[in-house]
């Protein structure tokens, strides 16, 4: 029983630690995450998940599509 409780506490601690280290260090980081998610729900065409090409300056190779259609080691 004690081992089970320790395992539950450890999992909760590691989950919280992962969340804390993944959020940008800002006093209103949670608010920013909420606003970004809310914006993407209202404007699904602006969502990063719908983007199928890479912006300029992103590294690329022959198999990756750039938004401009030009790839010379980086998207132009």
UniProtKB/Swiss-Prot annotation:
Q: Pfam family of this protein, just one? A: Conotoxin
User: PROSITE patterns from the xrefs?
Assistant: OMEGA_CONOTOXIN
GO cellular component terms attached to this protein's record:
extracellular region; host cell presynaptic membrane
- Any idea where this protein resides? Secreted
Q: What does the tissue specificity note say? A: Expressed by the venom duct.
Q: Which UniProt keywords apply?
A: Calcium channel impairing toxin, Cleavage on pair of basic residues, Disulfide bond, Ion channel impairing toxin, Knottin, Neurotoxin, Presynaptic neurotoxin, Secreted, Signal, Toxin, Voltage-gated calcium channel impairing toxin
Query: Looking at the keywords, is Disulfide bond present?
Result: yes
Q: List the disulfide bonds.
A: 53-67, 60-71, 66-75
- Could you tell me what this protein does? Omega-conotoxins act at presynaptic membranes, they bind and block voltage-gated calcium channels (Cav).
> Could you tell me what this protein is called?
Omega-conotoxin-like TxMKLT1-0211
């Amino acid at each position: 029983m004690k081992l089970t409780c320790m395992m539950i506490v450890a999992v909760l601690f590691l989950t919280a630690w992962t969340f804390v280290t993944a959020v940008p260090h800002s006093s209103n980081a949670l608010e920013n995450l909420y606003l970004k998610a809310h914006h993407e729900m209202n404007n699904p065409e602006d969502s990063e998940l719908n983007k199928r090409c890479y912006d300029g300056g992103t590294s690329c190779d022959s198999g990756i599509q750039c938004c401009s259609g030009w790839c010379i080691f980086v998207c132009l």
